[in-house]
């Protein structure tokens, strides 16, 4: 069987240590061979990122340039349609084959809203879910139906993520860094330092391009 790979999506406006450090820790905890970072295409009716798609992609490329764990995938940025996780995972599964163990990384807060996502039930047909713990969130879903769905798929053994191609939900004990992109944008707007929040190369790019001012 192939090595376990994971997909990690987000707006990354900008990418910061709160994105990178928990996922690097996760990779060590459960022996991930590769993490594919996929910046989202934000549809026109949603609040738009402050950086352009190209700038978000370039900041990500800088942030992971010395991290062989990560690979950048820009397919969602090339779409003119909304980014649906279910469709992205279906396409990824077709590329990787039926037997490859694949996972999608989300936060505990996102898990609780997962049943509202487009075609959510197909997500576990194509990948495992690796849930990064968030302080203050429970594992209680909004209804008994969704709670049963969660319990049916939960595993407490990360080996199960390697031995099957999809269908498991695993809650990972990853570190929580109280960093958000909105906090970084706010600090930059005020002219405050963000050296402890983002990689140096990303901060240099932000300054060179006058972003978030």
UniProtKB/Swiss-Prot annotation:
CDD domains: NMNAT. It catalyses: nicotinate beta-D-ribonucleotide + ATP + H(+) = deamido-NAD(+) + diphosphate. Signal peptide: none annotated. The keyword NAD applies. Pfam families: CTP_transf_like. InterPro entries: Cyt_trans-like, NadD/NMNAT, Rossmann-like_a/b/a_fold. The keyword ATP-binding applies. Keywords: ATP-binding, NAD, Nucleotide-binding, Nucleotidyltransferase, Pyridine nucleotide biosynthesis, Transferase. Pathway: Cofactor biosynthesis; NAD(+) biosynthesis; deamido-NAD(+) from nicotinate D-ribonucleotide: step 1/1. It comes from Escherichia fergusonii (strain ATCC 35469 / DSM 13698 / CCUG 18766 / IAM 14443 / JCM 21226 / LMG 7866 / NBRC 102419 / NCTC 12128 / CDC 0568-73). HAMAP family: NaMN_adenylyltr (MF_00244). This is Probable nicotinate-nucleotide adenylyltransferase. Its EC number is 2.7.7.18. Belongs to the NadD family. GO terms for biological process: NAD biosynthetic process. It comes from the Bacteria. GO terms for molecular function: ATP binding; nicotinate-nucleotide adenylyltransferase activity. Catalyzes the reversible adenylation of nicotinate mononucleotide (NaMN) to nicotinic acid adenine dinucleotide (NaAD). The gene is nadD. Gene3D superfamilies: HUPs.
